Design a protein with these regions (language model features):
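Residue-level marker of positions within ordered structural domains that often coincide
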Residues: 5, 9, 64, 105, ...
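Aromatic-glycine hotspot motif
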Residues: 57-63, 106, 148, 155-157
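A contiguous catalytic/ligand-binding core that recognizes phosphate-bearing ligands
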Residues: 37-102
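Structured surface interface patches that mediate subunit assembly and partner/cofactor docking
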Residues: 19-29, 76, 115-120, 129
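Beta-strand/loop substructures that line and gate deep hydrophobic ligand-binding cavities in soluble
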Residues: 79-138, 142-146, 155
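Hydrophobic ligand-binding cavity/cleft-lining segments
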Residues: 1-43, 147, 154-157
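Residue-level preference for alpha-helix termini and adjacent loops
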Residues: 6, 14, 19-22, 40, ...
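Hydrophobic pocket/interface hotspot
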Residues: 1-4, 59, 110-112, 144
Length: 157
């Protein structure tokens, strides 16, 4: 879970196609090592997908070695977005969950679930972006798997 705990811009990166993320101005720099300074996530911490003004998530819960749950955050305030106070148009909210489950002796399965709710006027946006998000998230998971299997070690900085 150490690799997942450090997800985000200005942290460990997103472990995906860095050059594509940066074409979109995300300023992502992926690392292949565990960064001790990004391992202690707390509820309310912000996980950015790019610089100020880009989408971001707020940590809902973080159990080291077990789970990480994120929810969309307001790009201006960093506060979690509430579905119950949403406007009727131009609104979306996402949750992103990472769960580690024992799979076998010396093996772990990383489960990822994303949920997205949006107003009907934004349905066309998500029809365009969901396939791209799938490709990027698949690359992220493959990279996390490769790094975990290689036994990424903690390096003191």
């Amino acid at each position: 879970m150490a690799l997942v705990a450090q997800l985000g811009q200005g942290r460990g990166g997103l472990y995906s196609y860095e050059s594509l993320e940066n074409l979109a101005g995300c300023e992502i720099h992926n690392t292949e090592r565990i960064l001790p300074e990004h391992q202690n996530l707390q509820p309310g911490n912000l996980i950015r997908l790019g610089p100020q003004g880009y989408p971001c998530f707020s940590v809902v819960s973080a159990e080291p070695g077990r789970s990480l749950v994120l929810i969309s955050a307001d790009i201006k305030t960093g506060m979690p977005i509430s579905f119950f106070s949403a406007p009727e148009k131009g609104f979306s909210i996402a949750t992103w969950q990472f769960i580690l489950e024992p799979a076998a002796e010396n093996a772990t399965r990383l489960l990822v679930r994303e949920r997205l709710v949006y107003t009907p006027d934004l349905s066309w946006v998500w029809r365009l972006t969901e396939p791209v998000a799938f490709v990027m998230e698949r690359k992220m998971l493959l990279t996390i798997r490769r790094l975990a299997e290689a036994g990424s070690r903690i390096e003191e900085i």
